[in-house]
Amino acid sequence: MFLIILIYQAEWMRTPESGIAHITLLDQFTRNTKRATAGAWSGDERGLRNALDMIYSGKYAKLPQVMQAMTLMPLMHAEHSEIQDLSAYHYSELAKKSEHIDYNGSAKSHRDVVVNFGRFPARNKYLGRETTALEAVYQANGGKF
């Protein structure tokens, strides 16, 4: 199934609605079907590229707020501080438009982890990365990401 998601990318990205479906599959499908393996993040790079494409092409602005929030998920999951800043900005803009959904909390907590560590320490053991002493303390104290 993942191969189909990748092969037909151009078709998926033709409309804002199918674009968000594709981004959600890339961002969430792999996280849930390949949990606790390096494959959990195998859709991240393409999902991020597609999300940025949606934002900068103007398709993002045509989506309802909930779909905009889903479009931003790959930004929130990126291990790049500049992308995290962009995520926090867009989620804060969504929060200004919504009285009922707190879009800021999760975006800020993801951003803080990447700003502090340059990555998400919880991924280390699955990606074969060494965990630093500070990351170990963070994880021992309930760090989520």
Place the predicted regions along the sequence by residue:
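Intrinsically disordered, low-complexity activation-like regions
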Residues: 1-145
